[in-house]
Each structure stands twice: as structure tokens, then as C-alpha cells.
Amino acid sequence: MIEKKYIVALDQGTTSSRAIILDHDANIISISQREFTQIYPKPGWVEHDPMEIWATQSSTLVEVLAKADISSDQIAGIGITNQRETTIIWEKETGKPIYNAIVWQCRRTADACTKLKQKEGLEEYIRQNTGLVVDPYFSGTKVKWILDNVAGARERAEKGELLFGTVDTWLVWKMTQGRVHVTDFTNASRTMLFNIHNLEWDQHILDELQIPRSLLPSVHSSSEIYGQTNIGGKGGTRIPISGIAGDQQAALYGQLCVQPGMAKNTYGTGCFLLMNTGTDAVRSNHGLLTTIACGPRGEVNYALEGAVFVGGASIQWLRDELKLIADAADSEYFATKVKNSNGVYVVPAFTGLGAPYWDPYARGSIFGLTRGTNSNHIIRATLESIAYQTRDVLDAMQADAGTRLQALRVDGGAVANNFLMQFQSDILGTRVERPVVRESTALGAAFLAGLAVGYWKDLDEVKSKATIEKEFRPGIETTERNYKYNGWKKAVARAQDWEDKG
């Protein structure tokens, strides 16, 4: 029998699909990545083509094995991690999507959310049972929108002809040739349709949104065998799909934040801060979400989460729209060309503001411009906005959990930016720890998949794989920290409530 030497993580993100092969020591052996199209039909609307998601993800899986010259029978299991909340509805018979995937960033259901909030007691019911706030970010109103706006969709859904899934569900369904319709607890907890206390779909919310239960996948733990997939067609080896977690929960697990009070921030397209609260679903009084995280064996734990909609995307904006930089990495170079932002604050509320403000009507703004402002000040202020938004969330989190973080673990593309990491530590007054393996999201999916198939014995074995590459410590005084942060709060207050409401 051929030795099962490797684990594969499929990382289906907002802008690209990736496949990553890891060995027993959690070293990355090979990575394959393919970008796909971002579709913007109207201002504030964001879509993906589900078939393109599948095409890019399946081809990276074949590519990554070929690139590393590894045969599929050497793979012990596959873990899937995915952009969360993004909503796909397809025909059960043909596997054909009836509409594009509506992406988590899409704000088209803002008015539908306003209407839901007007129903007596419903907003509080949703908050209490799903841990979420009523917001276009989550899948629930996206599902309703597709059923209401695609001809014949509601009738077909009621006849049981259609299936709904977040991206993980769609990938597993495609990988198993339509045999398996599942999701995991972490992804289900982001739909605004799932009761995080009794771990079941919430019939009252389904009724309010007129969503037939037959659309929904069955819900499982994040670390178990859901089904098998063939790589390389009929002759290929059947490999267990044995781990699923939404990208932020996967990153929390990959950073081994499996004890209550441990927290991480992922700096991707958006920024996502999660703090593990163990078996206690802590309710937030500060505009944060209560969500499901992975416990030591992939079982249900809870976490507080704050989502910042625009993190690394603001650096892309500097590059693609403003043309101030040629490459994302240039932002660090130009930011350090000036000694401070010269009083400039950039509030990148391009699609509204997430936690702790939850204002879909806020818009992007630049404040504090003077005749002496140059492009380097704007670049620096844009990077600083990522750190300020992180502090907004972290302050709320510490207040809710009644604890002070000793350190923040960080991952995602923007953590390579040393200026940003140092400023993050400065503005938090907290240690920032950057791991050797930056791919925490893929690592989490790999750990969950590997534990389910016995590739790693237990979490203790896994823990020896995570080492800190660099620690950033605060380098400014409290007075300066507070002065800078107060300026940020003033800027945010002015950016809020800009767009006309419906």
C-alpha cells in the first residue's frame, strides 16, 4: 500500500481559488492558484460565476499534484476552506446554477434587511438565535433575493428541485458528482438561518424569509469524512473529503487559537478578528457577532467576530483605481517615506462599515487634507485605516469577553507589510505575533482534514507545527496612541450615514 504522505487544502477565496499540499510537518510542498472574475452588475452589487469558481478550484487541484509530481493515492485527505456567506442556488438534477453566486460583500439586500428590522421582535430573535445582526452580509436575505427575482425559482424551490449552498457545499456537491449535500457548523452559522444553540436550521426564520427547508444542506462537524472524491477521473484514487471550515474559522484553528481568550486577525480582502470563547456563546453588547468556531477536535466552540469589509482591498484601490502604487508591496515603501500621515485619515467605507458600526450607508472618505498633503500621506493613512479598524473591533471584543488580550496572532496577505504590523502593535498597545507559515486558513483546513483521517493523532501533535516568525511590540506612548485613535473616531463619525436610505 502506498503511504499517505500528504494533506491537500482547498482554499476557495473571494478573488482566487487555491490548492495547497502540506506534509506531516505542516510544510507547504506546493501551491496552485487561479484568479476568477469579479462581477459588479450595479453599484454595491458583487457576484461570481459558480461554474468559474468550480473550474478554477478543480483545475488547481489537478495542477498542484502535477506540479509537485505527487500521485493522488499519496493524499490522506482533503480539507476545504472557503469565502463565507456567498450564496449559490442550483438545479438538483443538472447541477446548473440558476443565478450567479451573490458574494458576501454584496449590499443589494440592504432594503430587505431594513424591512426585516421593522417586523416586531424579529431582529432580536435573529440576534438571539443566530448570533448575527440583520445585515446584507449574511446568506439569508441573499437566498430570498434569488427566490424572489429569478423567474420560477420560488415554485421550483418549493417542489424540491433546487439546492442552496455556501461555497463549501457547492464544492463538495461538485466533487462528489452530486452525491453529497452538506455544510459544516461554521459555514451554517454565517447564513442567518441557523440556530447556533440547538445546532439546527431555524424554522421561524426560514418561514419569515419564505425559504423552503428542502433547499438546505445537512450540517456536520468541521472534522469528519463527508464523502469521497476522484482526482483524475475514473481511474483516479478516491480521496476522503474530511475537513470543512469557513475561512476565518479555519484561520483561527490554523493559528491554534483553540483555548478561550485566544484571538487572531486575518488581513485579506476584508479584515476578520475572531476570539475563541470556548463552549460559551458570549453575546456582544458592542456590535460584534457570536459565531461558531472549531474546538480542539473540530467540534463546536464559539467565538466573537468582528468583520471589517475593506482591509487589503483598500491597498488594491490605491493600486488599481488611484494608481498611486504599481504593486501592493510598494505601499510599505511609500508609507515610510513620510514620518506620519500629516493628520490625514482615510475611512475606506466603500461598501458601508462592518463591526462595530454596522452602517451600510457609510461611504469612503478622506479627511484632514491640507495643501501639504501628498500621495505618500494618503498611502500611509490607507494602511493605518486597516489597523484602526482592527482596534475598533478588538476594543469591543475585550469589553464583551471581559478580558485583555496578551497578544494578537495575525495572518493573511497584508501581514508581510512590516510597517502595518508595527503600526498595528502601536495603535493596540498589544503584542502582535506573525507565524512562520502565513497560510493559516489553509493550515486550519489541513489540520481539520488530517485529524479526521488519523494523519495527525491529536492536537498536541499538531501544536508542535506552529511557530512564531516575528513579534511586534508597541513603540509609542499611550498619549500619542490615544491622540491618533481619537482622530480616527472623529473621521468615522463624519463618514457615517452618507448614502440616502432606500
From Swiss-Prot:
* GO CC annotation terms, alphabetical: cytosol
Q: Cite the annotated pathway.
A: Polyol metabolism; glycerol degradation via glycerol kinase pathway; sn-glycerol 3-phosphate from glycerol: step 1/1
Tell me its EC number(s), please: 2.7.1.30
Please state how the activity of this protein is regulated.
Activity of this regulatory enzyme is affected by several metabolites. Allosterically and non-competitively inhibited by fructose 1,6-bisphosphate (FBP) and unphosphorylated phosphocarrier protein EIIA-Glc (III-Glc), an integral component of the bacterial phosphotransferase (PTS) system.
Enzyme kind, highest EC tier: transferase
Keyword list, A-Z: Allosteric enzyme, ATP-binding, Glycerol metabolism, Kinase, Metal-binding, Nucleotide-binding, Transferase, Zinc
Q: Pfam families under this entry?
A: FGGY_C (PF02782), FGGY_N (PF00370)
Q: Where does ADP bind?
A: 14, 18, 269, 312, 413, 417
Q: Per its record, what are the GO molecular function terms?
A: ATP binding; glycerol kinase activity; metal ion binding
Q: Which domain of life is it from?
A: Bacteria
Transmembrane spans: none
Record-linked Gene3D superfamilies: 3.30.420.40
Q: Which catalysed reactions does the entry list for this protein?
A: glycerol + ATP = sn-glycerol 3-phosphate + ADP + H(+)
The subunit field of the Swiss-Prot or TrEMBL record says: Homotetramer and homodimer (in equilibrium). Heterodimer with EIIA-Glc. Binds 1 zinc ion per glycerol kinase EIIA-Glc dimer. The zinc ion is important for dimerization.
Which family is this protein grouped under?
Belongs to the FGGY kinase family.
Q: What is this protein called?
A: Glycerol kinase
Source organism of this protein record = Photorhabdus laumondii subsp. laumondii (strain DSM 15139 / CIP 105565 / TT01)
